[in-house]
């Protein structure tokens, strides 16, 4: 069974026991969280349920396995001939989740 969930303004296709990295979610390591904004749910051999915009009664349960930071991204701005240069770096904080269960009532 698979589902398409909405987390942090992005969409992720998840299966049971899959591991995904999403934007930081506050919580302790090992704690369980539930996603209720499920955009689509289905099985590979059967027709899927597509939400309008979400599937009612569908829940994805996940466990927080790690809190980490992504690779550094360099932002560089320059205006030619004006001696204008700005350099900044950014590291996005991420949460690693293990999908435990996908249910639809």
Curated annotation (Swiss-Prot):
**Which GO biological-process labels does this protein carry?**
translation
User: Which terms in the Gene Ontology molecular function aspect does this entry carry?
Assistant: rRNA binding; structural constituent of ribosome
Task: Tell me yes or no: is Ribosomal protein among this UniProt entry's keywords.
Answer: yes
Task: Tell me the InterPro entries matching this sequence.
Answer: bL21-like (IPR028909), bL21-like_sf (IPR036164), Ribosomal_bL21 (IPR001787), Ribosomal_bL21_CS (IPR018258)
Entry keywords, A to Z: Ribonucleoprotein, Ribosomal protein, RNA-binding, rRNA-binding
Q: Which GO terms describe its cellular component?
A: cytoplasm; ribonucleoprotein complex; ribosome
Function, in words: This protein binds to 23S rRNA in the presence of protein L20.
Family stated for the protein in its record: Belongs to the bacterial ribosomal protein bL21 family.
The record's NCBIfam families line, in alphabetical order, gives: L21 (TIGR00061)
Task: Please give the name of this protein.
Answer: Large ribosomal subunit protein bL21
This chain's source organism reads: Rickettsia canadensis (strain McKiel)
Provide the organism lineage as a comma list: Bacteria, Pseudomonadati, Pseudomonadota, Alphaproteobacteria, Rickettsiales
């Amino acid at each position: 069974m698979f589902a398409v969930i909405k987390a942090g303004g992005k969409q992720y296709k998840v299966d049971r026991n899959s591991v995904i990295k999403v934007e930081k979610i506050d919580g302790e390591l090992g704690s369980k969280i539930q996603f209720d904004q499920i955009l689509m749910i289905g099985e590979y051999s059967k027709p899927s349920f597509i939400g309008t915009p979400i599937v009612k009664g569908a829940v994805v349960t996940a466990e927080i396995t790690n809190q980490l930071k992504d690779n550094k991204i360099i932002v560089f701005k320059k205006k030619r001939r004006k001696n204008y240069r700005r350099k900044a770096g950014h590291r996005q904080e991420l949460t690693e989740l293990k999908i435990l269960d996908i249910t639809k009532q």
